[in-house]
């Protein structure tokens, strides 16, 4: 059964937050299921989100909802187990719109993920994400 794998024990980190305003634009808004809140990165050549899960997971899908005009043309999902180095799982290519986009992921058993957003549609390299979901199952 596929379900959301991000839980309260999942540790998340992000590359940046717009104007360091974590209250309004922080990483917690990626997972709060609120249509009114978002993570807004600061400017830069690429942005990323890392997730450390409390147990081994098998990822099957990645869901992302960007704000149109502040999306990424190319993304990379990397993962690892324990202290191993991250390895590339898959590249994905989001569309520049406001829709929730689903990307199938080749079966990967990991406890750490890194999602990197490259080639932002915004001139300054900012990325705005309303929802980030990792779907799959616990191993």
UniProtKB/Swiss-Prot annotation:
Q: Name one GO cellular component term.
A: nucleoplasm
Q: Which UniProt keywords apply?
A: Nucleus
Tissue specificity remark: Expressed in all tissues examined, with highest expression in heart, skeletal muscle and pancreas.
**Entry's localization field:** Nucleus
Question: Which Gene3D superfamilies does this entry report, sorted A to Z?
Answer: Galactose-binding domain-like (2.60.120.260)
Instruction: Please give the subunit comment from the record.
Output: Interacts with NR2C2/TR4.
Tell me the function of this protein: May act as a repressor of NR2C2-mediated transactivation by suppressing the binding between NR2C2/TR4 and the TR4-response element in target genes.
| UniProt record similarity statement | Belongs to the NR2C2AP family.
Please state what the protein is called. Answer: Nuclear receptor 2C2-associated protein
């Amino acid at each position: 059964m596929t379900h959301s794998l991000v839980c309260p024990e999942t540790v998340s980190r992000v590359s940046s937050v717009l104007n360091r305003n974590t209250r309004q634009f922080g990483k917690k808004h990626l997972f709060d299921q609120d249509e009114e809140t978002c993570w807004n990165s600061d400017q830069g050549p690429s942005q990323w989100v890392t997730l450390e899960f409390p147990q081994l997971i098998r990822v099957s899908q990645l869901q992302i909802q960007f704000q149109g005009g502040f999306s990424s043309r190319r993304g990379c999902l990397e993962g690892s187990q324990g202290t191993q180095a991250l390895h590339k799982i898959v590249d994905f290519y989001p569309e520049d719109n406001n829709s929730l986009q689903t990307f199938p992921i080749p079966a990967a058993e990991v406890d750490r993920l890194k999602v990197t957003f490259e080639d932002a549609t915004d001139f300054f390299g900012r990325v705005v994400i309303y929802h980030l979901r990792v779907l799959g199952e616990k191993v």
